[in-house]
């Protein structure tokens, strides 16, 4: 439960109305009930500003009310951004309360962990693993030998982290993600079989990284697969062995980066993108969804298509593709006309 | 074990031969052994009708035997559909028997569950969660705070359901699926970092939904990500935050629906389809495998390609694409011929 | 810990220097420390041959040293392949040591397992399941009724194997893979709903198969989904019901094979490939990443594109696609020129 005053303080906002009004949750403006907080940002919803039953409403500082309203008002620079922070307030409060160790937890001999950790039931932590302060490990997680996890990191149920991997501070790893599974490396043999190339590197996840549900990150053959600080990976993403993902790069769901490719900083990859192995992708590269990248990409380029091309060029080519049958018809008709013209010229030259 | 009579009753069929013949399982017609039931639907297998060792055979009502056969016969309108029901008989019998609570189950204080539930070992059920009647929860499942699960729903091993999600009745959720993980929402900051936008909505799965292994469904930012009744999702499908999937829509493996898109009723999406965010897909839309959808689609349209186009139009364009080098050659040759023609005309006009 | 002599014996190599030199691990040549072994294969790193602090160095037999070096040398035909084997030595030693049964393991009545098995905590093994010799089952694994697992197979944390599946010998199954989930089969009903077609077959994995993290393999409707010996599947691969994958075929991450398709032997599929259902793919077929296969493919063909075509043909078409706007311009200009030519001819014929 938070008061208007507390929330306004948190948001650097100002209260109009009763500062002691309290709320226990957030609602959409059109569904606001007493005890909830709502916000107004999208003009389409303006009418609800005057009818909402919410107890507190977030308004932009420059919004002029046409008449007085019932809820306590908190004025902020940007109500839309403000609501995110309010949600964070509630969420963090709830999570921060979870600490201690459930029954049925497998801990190693001489286990090293920081203060205020939570470890859920049926979680297995192998020998040599270490947790920082305020780490939350949900139930049914596997943390292999010598894994280290930084402060404040949250590991959701069913995550599996193989031996020797390093997880930074302030990370969030969603359910059933797998970190440190063997890279996909095999040496073809003369008889057609493949011999496994042992993968004895690890995965290093730096700070402030979020990893989506079901995402898989393979360990390096030797050395480290590296996910730099601030990277955000969506669900079901595949990061192969020896890959490096630069700082603050964002990768949407079901994208795959093949072995040994290096992705720069501050890139944005949409969903279902594929990057083949051994490439170098620059900084601030944008790749449209479903695109396939098979060549190095310089800094700042926007890519689209399969095979991927510079986005604007691909769009121009695709615009013609849409009408290819008409182009074919034009050419067929030209062929006929030119034959007639050639015939006529020949007739005349005879 | 079921008798021919029981099975015929179940299928609305009629028995020819001994009604008390019993079977304990189903076999392919070419592999039928005593004590099994087989069916004949594909003409390619007709010879086996006369040689199978199965004890019971399902035949279409209109199939005329060329000679008498050993197995007891059950005549039905459609043997192929009939076999599905018979399989169901056996399967349901087996599953329905599972009830009770294994040891090593984590249950909350004052846990509310219906009759005839099964809860497997190492499953964690958080406070406030409720199960309906005859719910089967396999081992190693995580059910978060305040989750509700409707009657007869089956949750296979390793499924993780985050707090506050709602699962309907008669649903099946396959192993390692994740429901309610955070939506992929971040606000870019001036310094290049991204700030997490808390995702405090939930996921609502209505009745009769099947969800494949490893599929991920993210919770909404505010409100609900919604999967309507009768929807069938295959394996490794990604449903992003705020998405809605309409009634009886079927989505094949590895397809991804990006944030806030609304998919209509009775659509059929093949595998590896991608739908970008904030779109509206109509009812009864069909999308071919691997297609990318980047625009709204009206009711009933068939889509194909990347970027996606109306299927028939895409096919015509692609037919020309297949022979683009020939088209290029035709044009090159025309360019030369026209140059010659122009030259000749000029010569003559001089 | 291994001596130079032991390692040389294992690699069929010869020692130059002290055969009793021992190492406890492997390092990159530029990071070699005493007690480690390094290798030299990439000419870019040649200078480190003369400066590395590693205790043992693997060199190609034909490499000529320019001056004497400190480490003990092991000469082999191919240092790069050699290092893989050395890594294997260390890895296998570590793993082979793991045996016995953790506490909190769910074992069935009259459980049958071979010698030297390891079973991790929170693993559930259902009735009728059997493990061969030296099987390693990590924590939090689910092994359903009557599943059999062959000798030396390693099953990583969180793997779920449904009832009745058969896993061969010397297999490796990575974390959170799912084997034997229901095939995606539904019969449309007159009212728009879908009725589940029970999937009562199983999955058969032969020997020497590796299965990546998060990969899903569905059970057959009737009969078996079959993964033949020597097959290697990367992460997040989807194998649908009734599929067969031939011997020694390698399939990279996020590829999906739809229902009932048969893939031949010794094929190589890159990442994010899609194969639609009911196809027959020959032996030794190569499919480039992201390609979509919608037709049968004969032995030995290389495929590329979406829809997939013979790779060389696709590349030629795509080369024209890149410059389609220029082609369109050429045609437009031809149309004009031909109109002028026609006009002129007409003028003259008048």
What are these regions (language model features)?
Chain A
Residues 39, 100-310:
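Structural signal for interior beta-strand "rungs" in well-ordered beta-sheet cores
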Residues 1-103, 170, 176-177, 182-196, ...:
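Terminal amphipathic alpha-helical/low-complexity segments used for targeting or macromolecular assembly
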